Amino acid sequence: QFVDGKRWKHCGGLEAVTPEMKVTIAGQACFLLLNRDYGQNFAKVLTIMIYPSASLAGEEGENALPPVDAWPSSCVLLAWDEVKKTARDLRDERNEVIREFARQLDLEDGKEDGRPVIWDECQHTAWARVMSGEFLRHEFTRNGGRLAAKLTAGDPAEVFAAATELFFEMPDRLMQQHPEFYEMLR
């Protein structure tokens, strides 16, 4: 359903979107949908645009990756070299597909604010407390790492995307170092 329900577009000199590309991306993106009682298979994502390489970022011309703030919210742009690299190493804290689709979960309510749609009021209150700047500052500056760096940048959406990557890439570490945050993502 995910593969057939999206428009797949090759960009930046990529010759074609292959079945391998679709399955690799869909398999990782759909991890984010497991155990969710709500949401519609990334219904707002209409197009997945695949570029051959992240090195096209900042380039000029028709093959260049557009800047992140120029992406329409109905599109997910991915660099195939990064998708393959981050999919291979399950313990490097990075996953291109999970990060970009975490942003889509964040956008389900129309705002990229680090707060995905949560229907249960108790969960909403707990999420607000755990995601509050004070809690995050204490938790992540104490233990350092990528999340602390994202937090100091002051962008809750980036913190959510990076934390989601960490949840799938290194769940034991996240659970050990930040148990409340882990439970919110679970």
Predicted regions and their residues:
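Metalloprotease/metallohydrolase-associated module, dominated by Zn2+-dependent proteases
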Residues: 8, 26-35, 55, 60-88, ...
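Active-site recognition of the HExxH zinc-binding catalytic motif
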Residues: 92-109, 161
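Generic beta-strand structural signal
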Residues: 46-48, 74-76, 94-95
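Short, well-structured alpha-helical interface segments that form or flank functional binding sites
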Residues: 20, 88-92, 96, 156
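Amphipathic alpha-helical interface segments used for dimerization/assembly
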Residues: 3, 105, 185-186
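Contiguous, non-catalytic segments that form substrate-binding/exosite surfaces or channel walls
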Residues: 1-59
